[in-house]
Structures are given as C-alpha cells and as structure tokens.
Amino acid sequence: MAPTDQLQEVKIMLHGTAASEGIGIGKVMLIEEHSLEYTPRTVTDTEAESQRFKAAVDAFCYNTEKQAENLRSSAGEKEAEILAGHIQIIKDPYLSGEIEKLIADGQCAESALEHMCDMFIAMFSAADDELTKQRAADVRDIKSGVLGILLGVNEIKVSDAPKGTVLVARELTPSVTAGIVKKNIAGIITETGGTTSHSAILARALEIPAVLSVEGVASSLKNGDTVVVDGSEGAVIVNPDDNTVAEYSKKRDAFLAERKELENYRGRETKSASGEVYELFCNIGKPEDAVKAVDADGEGVGLFRTEFLFMDRTSIPTEDEQFEAYKKAALILKGKSLIIRTLDIGGDKDIPYLGLEKEENPFMGFRAIRYCLKNRELFKSQIKAILRASAFGDIKIMFPLITTMDELREGKKLVTECKADLRNMGINFNENIQVGVMVETASAAVIADMLAKEADFFSIGTNDLTGYTMACDRGNNDVSYLYSPLQPSVLRMIKRTIECGVQNGISVGMCGEAAANKLMIPLLISFGLTEFSVSAPSVLNVRKIISTWTKEEADKVTAKVLEMSTQQEIVEYLKSVV
C-alpha cells in the first residue's frame, strides 16, 4: 500500500461552522464546478448577440423556476424565494441594461455578463455584513447558470446521488441544492458559508446535517471517502473507524428519536416544571410565513419583519398593498398575537430604489427608526396600513433600533396622527393598539427604566444587542469569538431590560436567536422573560426545554452564572448543568 493511501485511511477530525443540526454518516460525493472557460471575442452582429443573451436569460429563468418549484415542495415557500430572487436579479433593469450596452459596444455575451456580474460580486463581497456578502454568492450562482447555457455546459445535478451520500463542495449553490432528493443525502460539507448563508438556510429547511466553512475540504477529500458530519458541533470525521461509526450512529439515532419525541409537545401549553406559563411565538418575514407559525404550533407571531415587503421590487409598496399583507397574516393567525416591526431598512438591508447613500458603517448609521422619522410620509403610510389591519386581529406595533426617548415619543406621536387621519376617514382600527420597543442597543437597555414607562411592551433583539454591546460583527472571523449573548455584559443588558419591564408592568419578549438557545433559556426564565419568539422549526424544542426547568432551579443556575466573569466560564458551566 502506498504511503499516501495509508495517510488517507487515518481518522481525521476537521472543524467548521455548525450550520444544520444532526448527525450524518455516508460516502463523499464531490460537487466539482464545471469549466466555464471561453475565448473573449468581438462581435459585429450585436443584435444577434443581444438575442443570444436574452435567449440564455429566458432559459435560465425557466430552469430556475423549475428549481424553485422543487424547493417549494421539498423545503418551503421561503426557501423557494431564494431562487425566485435570482430571476429578479438577472432581470434587474440596471444589470441587464448594462450587459446590453457592453454587447452593443461589441463584447460577446459571455464577456459582458461576466464583466457586470464580477463587478456586483466584488461590490457585495466588500460589504461589512454577512447578509450582503451572501448576495455575492447569489450573483456567482446566476453567472454560472447563464454562462453555462451560453457555452452549452450541462447543469451540475445531484438528483441521482445514491442513498447515504454526503455532498462536499467549495460552495453549494441554491441552484444545485434545489436538486437534492432529501432522503438520499446524509450530510453537506462546504468550504464557504456561515449560519446565515443560503447553503445553511436550505440545509436546515431540508433537515440535512451540515458543516460549513471547512477549510480546504473539497480538495482534501475524494469521492467514496467515508465521513461523519456532526452538524450540531461543527465537526467532520474523515475515515472513521468502526467504533467511531458506532458511536455516531447512536448519536444520530438519539437525535432522530428526540426530534420525534418533540411531537408530544404539540398542542401543549408552554409551561415550566414549576407551573409558570409563557407565550411562545414565531418570527416571520412575509404574510405567508404565518402559515408556518400556525403549523409549527406557535402561539402567535412575535416579530413580523416588514422590510421584506419592500425588497425584490422597484418601488415603495402602497398603503393598500401593505394593509393587505398585514391583514392576510392577521387572518391566518385567527386572533393570535401579531407583532409588526416597522421598517428596519439600512445596515444589512439595502433597498436600491430608496436611494440610501453608502455609509462607512451602516450599522451605526441612517437606518430603522432613524430613517423612518426622516421620511415621515413613508412611515405614516406603513403605520396607517398596520392600524387598518388591526381591525382584523390582535396586532401590535413595534419600533426598531430605539436609542432615545425622543425617538419613541416621535414614533408614538405619528401613530396618534395616523389614528386621527383614519378616524376622519371613517376607517376602523383598534383604538387601543399597543406600541412597543425593540431593545437591541446598549442605549435602549441602559434607559429601559425610562422607556418602560412609555412603551406598552419590550422585545429584546439579541442579535443586534450582542453586536452593539460587544462592538463586533459576527460575520468577521477575526472578532466573531466575541459575539455571544452569553458574554457577561450582554447578559446584564438582558437582565436589566427584563427587570425594568417587569417593574413597570409591561410584557417583555425576546425575538433574537438567543430565545431558542438551550443554554440561555434557564437564565431567561430566571430573569423574568414572559415571551419567547423563535423560528418555526424551534417551537416544540423550546417548549420542551422550558418544561424541564423549575423557577427555583433556574434561579440557582443564574445566580452562579452572574458571579462568573468570562463567557468561557459561563458556557462551560451551563453545558455541565443543561
């Protein structure tokens, strides 16, 4: 046996980002990118070349629509819309128009497409935040798809992968993922991507264990290698021995049994072991997602992200369009609580037609409530739409990124003005609609005692609160180690916010990822949180975790945690008791 063969048979542990929970054991199938090389050329018949480009785009859109339909049935509407977004990007008037101009100047369709796509990829890749960087991957996927059609290169297909396959790629694009036959794929490993990447989102939707950002994995593995994918811990074991396979087979079976057991918590009240009752809501981005909240057994919606209504279009949605969207969600929920967050534009969410200037640090700049208070007609249109929809369900209004009392008061003043306008028009709405604050900055947490006197409720956004408190971007690998809601400073911000809410008799919820974190839940119970708002797939698991804790036990654990001075110390302790 050659030395290299001996080396390859040694058990190796690789590490990456835990992107989709579960254990997968199977054989590697490398997803190798097709060569899309071509010789740039000058064209003289520019009209024919333009028609060639348009035909390729039409074929791409047709293929993408079919892929989206596959995803719609295997994963869901939200996941299918990732691919629908690809169609909107390639048909964007600016992108397609600039490509047409280059063709008119004599460039071949391949060169024109590649030039413009590479420009967009560079722009998105240079962004500070992870979500905008993700758009670079989308444009790469689009470029490959259209180039492949122009060059006559077949699509990469994984639909024929046999049962027990682990897909390994540098980057697993949405277009490739759409072809996955769920029952045949044991796991996914990629060199790129994080927890918010489309690879991760799709893997979670398909319930396939996934580990991403494993450096060099696509070049170090070969087809047929046996691997274990631990999507819960972010580990990949190459060439596992029999004992390792047996160990992880047990872990996989236990994980699947636990997932099945969670169905026993469907239809139950969300209650601690000592009898305290909590509200367990879902986070949604579109009215249709309210169906997922109901199907997941959520008790309402704790966060409706309205900015998605403004995206993937070329103009501001009208008041009537917004009203219909909010009304639709309210009717689906049939009287269950629906907390609608007003427009949170800026930061990682850019809407081109609004003409926001590029900022050096958009997360610290002109976004959310700051933008809305400077663009009052747009803001009032949204508030009126929410008020009108409140006649059809239990709707509440929530302002994002509040940092001062003035912002809350100005926002409430506009609500009062909008109520008067609707009253004068004879339009029904809930006169007593609640107006709350999303606590996601250190400033809001520090003045939570004052905000609680004028807000009807709080919802803690731990994702931004953690980033702002720790002054770090979780998408930046150099500082991502700081990003954790279990940092002592962040825990104290959360504790203070909840205590201020309780002391002033208002409800306090949490809609960040921490609300579903099993290490955080006993602390949140002890702090006095009353509402948990999580992703739909997390509902039953959170209900189960809450049911295992008494308030007394949670208080004891929390008291010890608050004596600790480092995140590492806190995490190690919580892992030993949770």
Show where each model-derived region lies.
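Non-catalytic, soluble scaffold/interaction modules
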Residues: 1-332, 338-345, 375, 382-383, ...
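Conserved alpha/beta-domain cores
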Residues: 259-578
